[in-house]
UniProtKB/Swiss-Prot annotation:
It comes from the Eukaryota. It holds the Pfam family RRM_1. It comes from Encephalitozoon cuniculi (strain GB-M1). The keyword RNA-binding applies. One of its GO terms (molecular function) is RNA binding. InterPro entries: Nucleotide-bd_a/b_plait_sf, RBD_domain_sf, RRM_dom. PROSITE patterns: RRM. This is RRM-domain-containing protein ECU01_0840. Residues 84-163 form the RRM domain.
Length: 163
């Protein structure tokens, strides 16, 4: 690596200093420095050492409370709790989604989403197991207890929490 001595372009600097500015320079204000407002961490209050005149320039006050408006948008991940899936196996190969839905509905009163039957990608044939999504893990445990001992076409239904 080569080290080159720095020589400023003094001639160019002097030439630029001689340029006369256009417009009324008296109306231009130059702010030397500004300081950002300080916030206390983990609170919603502005720092104690902030002066009263600085508080008026604070763009917003951080808030940890929920919005006061009841129709405020809440993302779906925050709105509903973590869902849980149950794997239903040992199902007959001629099973349909509607039939499985009616069988589960007849044995439990827990709300569940429509069952997803797992199909073979190449042939499109049912593979013998399905997944049911529920609102919580407690509902999943209740569904497993309710479906214990259920037989479909002389096949014992097996239910377990999906991994």
């Amino acid at each position: 690596m080569e080290v080159v001595k720095f020589e400023p372009d003094t001639e160019g600097i002097e030439r630029r200093r001689g340029i006369k500015p256009f417009g009324n320079i008296g109306k231009i204000r130059v702010i030397k420095s500004t300081t950002a407002p300080r916030f206390n961490l983990y609170t919603t209050e502005v720092g104690i050492d902030c002066k009263e005149e600085q508080k008026q320039y604070i763009p917003y006050r951080p808030s940890l409370e929920e919005p006061a408006v009841s129709n405020a948008y809440v993302p779906p991940t925050i709105k509903r709790p973590e869902t849980c899936s149950v794997k239903l196996s040992n199902l007959p190969l001629d099973m349909t989604r509607d039939r499985l839905h009616s069988i589960i509905k007849s044995h439990t009163n827990i709300f569940f989403m429509s069952p997803n039957l797992v199909m073979n990608r190449e042939t499109g044939a049912f593979r013998g197991f399905a997944f049911v999504t529920l609102e919580s893990r407690d509902d999943a445990v209740k569904l497993i207890k309710d479906l214990k001992g259920v037989a479909i076409d002389s096949l014992g239904l097996s239910a377990e929490i999906a991994r």
